[in-house]
Amino acid sequence: MVSIRLTFALAIVAIIFAFSVDAAYKKPPFNGSIFGKRSNTMTDYEFTSRALSAICEVASETCTAWMSRQESN
């Protein structure tokens, strides 16, 4: 009889803990969960894009200057 009561009490406690853990879970906001956060701050890919754009511009100017110098010789 005691073991049945103990088992029943432990089952009740386990169910209460299961509901309390479930209640602590909070879903992320839909706006940022799938599509990313929409803000005015620059993201990493924007910095990378600007850096690559600057490198390509410098390389293009250097190659143009070098090729025009090669043609004049």
Swiss-Prot record:
Prosegment residue ranges: 39-73
Main localisation: secreted
Modified residues (Phenylalanine amide): F35
Subcellular location(s) per record: Secreted
Keywords: Amidation, Neuropeptide, Secreted, Signal
Span of the signal peptide: 1-23
A single GO cellular-component term on record: extracellular region
Tissue: Expressed in brain, the retrocerebral complex and in ventral, thoracic and abdominal ganglia (at protein level).
Record-stated family: Belongs to the FARP (FMRFamide related peptide) family.
Protein's UniProt name: SIFamide-related peptide
Organism of provenance: Camponotus floridanus (Florida carpenter ant)
Taxonomic lineage from the root: Eukaryota, Metazoa, Ecdysozoa, Arthropoda, Hexapoda
